[in-house]
Amino acid sequence: MEASTQSGQSAGVWGGLSRQIAETIESVADSIVTVHGGGRSTSSGVVWRPGVIVTVRQGLRRSDSLQVAYGGGDPVQATLVGADAGTDLAVLRVETGATKPVETIGAQAARVGEVVLAVGRSALGDISGSSGIVARLGSGWRTWRGGQIDSLIRPDVQLYVGQAGSALVNEGRRVLGINSTALARNAVITIPAATVDRVVDAILERGHVPRPYLGAAMQAVPVPEASRAQFGEGVDEALLVLHVEANAPAATAGILVGDLVLSVDGKLVHNVHGVQRQLSTLKVGDPVAVAVIRGGVKMELKVILADRG
């Protein structure tokens, strides 16, 4: 009798959980679309605002032949407003449909261990879902392409074919963010709603996310041993300026071909990635000190960072 009671209770728990998962997926299904990104490429997309769909940049192959499909309906044309490699996000606009945006929630409401669902659509438009937990939460970070992510959300979910760009949904039927497989090796990262909002705002306003640049092509070269002591401890490599783009911030500041760049904003740089990493901490319009060696003399130039556009 006791075993029968326990079995019945277990069935009740699993039945309740199963219904809750199915109902949660159904509750957001009208806001999830299939994105046909050109060729055979498909991904999922999320209705973020009326007429505005957010998907992942990695799923777009051609910007001139984009379509989105709602459920089993016929695909409709979509226009690429802009895409951001730094965060792997792309913003599409449609003239029909996309009338039911998702309800979002901030990453601060998430808890490690809570059950979450990745909700997307297949290439045929069928709703798809996978479940897991929030495996890790963390503070803001920068992607390998220089994008600023407001907080780390790493779910333990498997994304099936077409689920890149899917929504990560919590038990309250709110969307924590957009799922991407392009920001970390062999891992799903959820781009939090705050980051998505910021990128969408920038793209709708400017067509891109503004990021500062110098406008100089450089290559790492060793600093002669005889000069290392003269230019400071740790200066064993510098960046040789090979080309300066006309009217770029570097040109305006007086950086010349042949200069050796030692540091940017007070930080030694040993390779181009070091420069990009340092620039990613700054904003368009910021003044930045660039230390160079010219003709054996160390000097510091003030560069006003601009938007590459």
Model-derived segments and their meaning:
Residues 29-31, 90, 95-103, 128-186, ...:
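Active-site region of chymotrypsin-like
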Residues 25, 43-46, 166-168:
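His/acidic/aromatic-lined binding-pocket segments of jelly-roll/cupin-type domains
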Residues 1-12, 23, 40, 49, ...:
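C-terminal recognition in membrane/secretory proteostasis and scaffolding
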Residues 15, 19, 107-110, 128, ...:
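Soluble non-cytosolic domains of exported or imported proteins
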Residues 51, 113-119, 168-173, 250, ...:
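A structural signal for short beta-strand/turn segments enriched in small hydrophobics and glycine
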Residues 9, 32, 38-128, 153, ...:
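Conserved active-site neighborhood of the chymotrypsin/trypsin-like protease fold
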